[in-house]
Amino acid sequence: MVIRVFIASSSGFVAIKKKQQDVVRFLEANKIEFEEVDITMSEEQRQWMYKNVPPEKKPTQGNPLPPQIFNGDRYCGDYDSFFESKESNTVFSFLGLKPRLASKAEP
């Protein structure tokens, strides 16, 4: 399965852009394979994202905002959940990936 990060490339909200960049930079820095899915370029992908965010994670009004993170078809969470997992050092578990062990250089 590949990690899919649903983003909006043409979002007018600075906060959304910063959150999207934070997720992407973290994944790149940790060499985690992922795919960016731009919901502003595909109505089909936008509707898929809206449909597959669990009801308890949907806002009371409107639609879920990017970034939304999936591992294949399995919902991982939104930015707030990602940030919490980053702070608690549980991102691999959050993403449904096996943790990587840091390797130490031999003296």
Curated annotation (Swiss-Prot):
Keywords: Nucleus, SH3-binding. Signal peptide: none annotated. One of its GO terms (cellular component) is nuclear membrane. Transmembrane segments: none annotated. It is found in: Nucleus. Highly expressed in brain, placenta, liver and kidney. Expressed in retina. It comes from the Eukaryota. Pfam families: SH3BGR. The keyword Glycoprotein does not apply. A motif (SH3-binding) lies at residues 61-67. InterPro entries: Glut_rich_SH3-bd (IPR006993), SH3BGR (IPR051033), Thioredoxin-like_sf (IPR036249). Its main location: nucleus. CDD domains: GRX_SH3BGR. The keyword Ion transport does not apply. GO terms for molecular function: SH3 domain binding. PANTHER family: SH3 DOMAIN-BINDING GLUTAMIC ACID-RICH-LIKE PROTEIN, SH3 DOMAIN-BINDING GLUTAMIC ACID-RICH-LIKE PROTEIN 2. Belongs to the SH3BGR family. This is SH3 domain-binding glutamic acid-rich-like protein 2. The gene is SH3BGRL2.
